[in-house]
From Swiss-Prot:
Positions of the UniProt region annotated as G2: 60-64
Catalyzed reactions: GTP + H2O = GDP + phosphate + H(+)
Regions crossing the membrane: none
Positions annotated to bind Mg(2+): T26
Top-level enzyme category: hydrolase
Record keywords: Cytoplasm, Elongation factor, GTP-binding, Hydrolase, Magnesium, Metal-binding, Nucleotide-binding, Protein biosynthesis
Role of this protein: GTP hydrolase that promotes the GTP-dependent binding of aminoacyl-tRNA to the A-site of ribosomes during protein biosynthesis.
GO MF, one annotated term: translation elongation factor activity
EC number: 3.6.5.3
Protein name: Elongation factor Tu 1
UniProt KW Phosphoprotein keyword: no
Length: 394
């Protein structure tokens, strides 16, 4: 057993608990750690250590998050749990804790509540691809029909937000019962772990995705041409590859004739590496910071999209006053700011610091984007909001 623990050859999957306040998210997190450590080995974590979540700052936004880890025989999981509702909203929108799948906790005693709905909507907006339901506190409900009713309600709610409500796994259990070592409820935690293993597909690694590198800097080197530098976000760039330069101006294609890192020439650059790419026949003034270098056809430039946005509170260094329609801030995508116009949902006149809101944004110049891309909202270089592209219109 001890040998297996140190093998990091297992696929790594990021998950997290979501759901209404007091439905048992943190208790479930503790129960998973405790039961799986008993069954498969690993470290148990108690409720208190998870509930005292440390504060972190992600893009200037204060978020309290607990990170725990656990193993099943086939996978290693990193799991996030947040103490407060506001922390979930911030976490999901900033992508501070990207999730490959979410565990939606719904108390059988209450059924779906307002935050249940809000977390499902947020999950849809920010692109959590898979949701598994853990119906908690089932030991407090004697009526089998009531349990069925709650399950049906949760499935319908998920379907309403385009999750496959009829097909996704719903596990009826008791996190507290499992934490207290009651066998029938411990078995439900193992069932949940098995559902995570089978229902959430292995995430595609960044290196296997189509190549993309945000351009941070552009140099021209006498006699060699133009070099663009940046950190490769995904995929692999090989010498000789055809690449597209996307965003801000019309898309052009060129060939990468050299890749270098720390002044050494390489055959290729991979996701996560900071490299310089030499571009054939490209002039210094044809490329700029804020564009991306990408595999041709893999990403397109857009100006108009729907987004889910969190507006920083005054305490987080955000605005002190609300903003209204007609507000024109800068939207910071990857490496650059672009001015944009916003339109607010019907019936919303103003947005207060600390709110989260859906807004449609129209940028003055196009940016390479796909759904799920994160951005910051800035005024004069100061971050006042964070958002994610939910749906592209144009």
């Amino acid at each position: 057993m001890s040998k297996e623990k140190f093998e990091r050859t297992k696929p790594h999957v990021n998950v997290g608990t979501i759901g209404h306040v007091d439905h048992g998210k943190t208790t479930l997190t503790a129960a998973i750690c405790t039961v799986l450590s008993k069954v498969y080995g690993g470290t148990a974590r108690d409720f208190a250590s998870i509930d005292n979540a440390p504060e972190e700052r992600e893009r200037g936004i204060t978020i309290s998050t607990s990170h725990v880890e656990y193993d099943t025989p086939s996978r290693h999981y990193a799991h996030v749990d947040c103490p407060g509702h506001a922390d979930y909203v911030k976490n999901m929108i900033t992508g501070a804790a990207q999730m490959d799948g979410g565990i939606l906790v719904v108390a059988a005693t209450d059924g779906p509540m307002p935050q249940t709905r809000e977390h499902i909507l947020l999950g849809r907006q920010v692109g959590i691809p898979y949701i598994i339901v853990f119906m908690n506190k089932c030991d407090m409900v004697d009526d089998e029909e009531l349990l069925e009713l709650v399950e049906m309600e949760v499935r319908e709610l998920l379907s309403e937000y385009d999750f496959p409500g009829d097909d996704l796994p719903v596990i009826q259990g008791s996190a507290l019962g499992a934490l207290n070592g009651e066998e029938q409820w411990e078995a439900k935690i193992v069932e949940l772990a098995e559902a995570l293993d089978s229902y959430i597909p292995e995430p595609e690694r960044a290196v296997d995705m189509p190549f993309l590198m945000p351009i941070e800097d552009v140099f021209s080197i006498q006699g060699r041409g133009t070099v663009v530098t940046g950190r490769i976000e995904r995929g692999i760039l090989k010498v000789g590859d055809e690449v597209a330069i996307v965003g801000i101006k019309d898309t052009t294609t060129t060939t990468c004739t050299g890749v270098e890192m720390f002044r050494k020439l390489l055959d290729e650059g991979r996701a996560g590496e900071n490299v310089g790419a030499l571009l054939r026949g490209t002039k210094r003034d044809e490329v700029e910071r804020g564009q991306v270098l990408a595999k041709p056809g893999s990403i397109t430039p857009h100006t108009k999209f729907e987004s889910e946005v969190y507006v920083l509170s005054k305490d987080e260094g955000g605005r002190h006053t609300p903003f209204f329609k007609g507000y024109r801030p800068q939207f910071y995508f990857r490496t650059t700011d672009v001015t944009g116009d916003i339109s607010l949902p019907e019936g919303v006149e103003m947005v207060m610091p600390g709110d989260n809101i859906q807004m449609v944004v129209e940028l003055i110049s196009p940016i390479a984007m796909d759904e799920g891309l994160r951005f910051a909202i800035r005024e004069g270089g100061r971050t006042v909001g964070a958002g994610v592209v939910a749906k592209i219109f144009a």
